[in-house]
Amino acid sequence: MNNINDNAAAAGSRPARRLNLVPLDERYGIGGKVIGVANAGPQVHVGISLADCRYHIHCLGPTGTGKTTLLARMILDDVEAGRGVAAFDPAKGDLIRDLLARLPKECGDRLVLIDPDEQQAPPAINLLDPAVHGGTAHDVAANLTAVMAKVWHRWWGHRTADICYHGLLTLAHLPGATLAQLPRLLSDGKWRAGRVNAVTSSLNAWEGNTLGEFWEGLNDLPAAQRSGLVAPLLSRLRLVLAHPMASSLFGVPATTFSFADILDGGVLLCRLPKGVIGEDGTRLVGSLLLAGLWQATTARARIAEDDRPDASIVLDECHNFLHLPIGIDDALAEARGLHTNFVLAHQYLGQLSGDMAEAIDANARNKVYFALAPRDAIDQSRHLRPYLDDGDLIRLGGYEVVLRPVAGGRIVPPVTADTEPPPPAEPGRATALRRAAREHTGLPLAERRRLLGETATGVGADDEALSGDELTQPPIEPPIEPHNFQPKGVDPERSPVTPQVTSHEAPREARRGDEHAGEHAPLHTTYAHVNDDEEDWWTGTD
């Protein structure tokens, strides 16, 4: 078998590239988000300033009232101004299609397109690479487990969390391992034994023993009982990863874009239609990508506030994706100071869980309402009194909104406005932008086959056991950069293709002085649990 170090080096033979971000001093535009034109009094544009957008925007309105049109205008304004924006579309995908036909052609070299229709050279990101998140293998396992716990909370419990966390932790210690290999790790005993042996023998004694004891305990269970314990996680994970879009995105030991680059001026368009990739696929893929953006947001704390460029994360049907490792209330509160604003759009309040609804109600202080159903109008009219009541919200016309904004950090009286239509579609623009995204942040199929074939831990690799020596690497410190901006006209290879990090994580944990690093417990993360009455661990029901 080839040495894993050689394989990792082969995967990293391509030079690192960056998205071609617009420098801060060259960014222009309205400096905020235009909502529409006032239809009472002087016909002037009304909107939210850039600083006040950091208080986040809650956009509520049933289907057919004009939400998608407004979201498209917001995103186009951000892109044209050179700001970073990530947009998630879980419905029919019309929002992303409309944007591709209208975005400026100059944004092609900072565009990342995640779309099931892209099959020639879709992007890739290895979520198990600690360098992608800027943390350790423990952080990777804890964050991904927390996301899955919230996405699948109805079928989740302590043992599922235990199995998921230790499986992800094992793979995160393996150079070239990917999320797509978690089902094989849990179901293929021979393949698992080689990988577990390699990882435990390469770690510090206390850490390797703790991880080894977990797998020994699982292996000692009767086969039927072991299968029952892993079945809930396996059945749902396989269902998602079986789709070509999910496997092409998360199943290759390479990364072609950076979440930090997106926030610093890139454009991430995620078209995740439920009718194509399934409801579980939409929720898990979108939530994992959002969690990556959240980790990049928290990393901005290392940058001086004046150097943090404003970025927007636009979530259509937001309830599908708000499964962050921390609470939504905490995330919205922290994101404001880190200059990342959320635009949270959905159709009616019943789509939100109780905690989610309270967090959005309190922390997304800019309110945009389209014509609402009576129940929602009664509830939300408390934000508008004494100026407007629930009847005013019910009687709004098509593409008409009530904006209750924040100005200078203070809530101001609401205004009514008519939203503006997006600019006309440009013939051939979508095709040109798809081609540009493919060239700058896509990974061709031939390259994917090479990476999977040359990486010792790749799917399809032989089952020969790995030795610990093959995993031991000199530690690599990820650089701490103040920002990701480059002047225009730099090297044309602009987007990152980062291979799986080959550094051993234990030395870095020792330097951090984390006394709990060897305990394999989630770091600063609480799992979502169900109670004992809601889960049958021993029959494997899911």
Where are the regions that the model predicts?
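Conserved P-loop NTPase motor module
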Residues: 1-36, 191-198, 228-232, 267, ...
